[in-house]
Amino acid sequence: MTAPLIYLIAGEQSGDAIGARLIHAIRAKRPDATFAGIGGSAMAEQGLTSLFPIRALALMGLLEVLPKIFELKALLRQTVADIQARRPDVLVTIDSPGFTLRVLKALQPTTLRRAHYVAPQVWAWRENRVKHYPGLWDELLCLLPFEPAFFARHNLQARFVGHPVLESGADTGNAERFRARHAIAADAKILTVMPGSRTTEVYRLLPILEQTIRLLPEPVVPVVPLAGPVEAVVRERTASWPIRPILVADTAGKHDAFA
């Protein structure tokens, strides 16, 4: 049996985490499988060499996308050319529909087996986008249990595969350990501050979140779980806060904070 080549594309940190778990799971069943594509640090730990840095795709909103539109088009062409040159057995695109669905569209027509992991949330907004999806993929893998029925109403087959947060160990955290580690009193109120994983989100949301904390009638202990791509920005931007937040970078620490 020929060793399969699986091409994966993840455009942001959440997709990178999903891609890493997918590579690990595939290797458990097919140790001979090889992988190529685009991913971040988590997928790199599983042995993937990314075609280009994932941060090039972690953009949000017109104000961030427009200045880099020509760069993004070049990355799209580079990705499509790499897929066509490698001729993988399967292509798995993970979330980031602004980029991944354009890759799938650019590959048409094709006999390549394609799976899109993390269904576009057209059930939440702009449902009319669903009319553009037929033919883009062979398998649509959903994180939420109601999504297959939604897509079935639009004559699109989809499969519920579970949410990655349930596989991440997020339910194993220990709140008492977190308080002890950071010398937080048992009766102190903790406020989790989540400014996002994209640079634009952080620049836009952190000032609002700081002002919100200032307006609270009771004192709180702000805790900020750090996303890798924006860790340096968050550290810099929160350094001058009058109420210094606890910054949590490690996974176990985040699980404890959420507990």
Role assignments for model-derived ranges:
Residues 1, 28, 85, 192, ...:
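Compositionally biased, intrinsically disordered/low-complexity regions enriched for serine, proline
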Residues 3-5, 89, 185-192, 221:
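Charged active-site motifs of nucleotide-sugar-dependent glycosyltransferases
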Residues 4-179, 194-202, 215, 227-229, ...:
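Active-site and donor-binding regions of nucleotide-sugar-utilizing enzymes
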Residues 33, 110, 158, 185, ...:
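Secondary-structure boundary/capping positions in well-ordered alpha/beta enzyme cores
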Residues 40-41, 50, 200-259:
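Donor-nucleotide binding loops and adjacent catalytic segments primarily
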Residues 76, 93, 138, 186-187, ...:
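A general secondary-structure boundary signal
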Residues 88-89, 138, 189, 256-259:
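Conserved acidic residues
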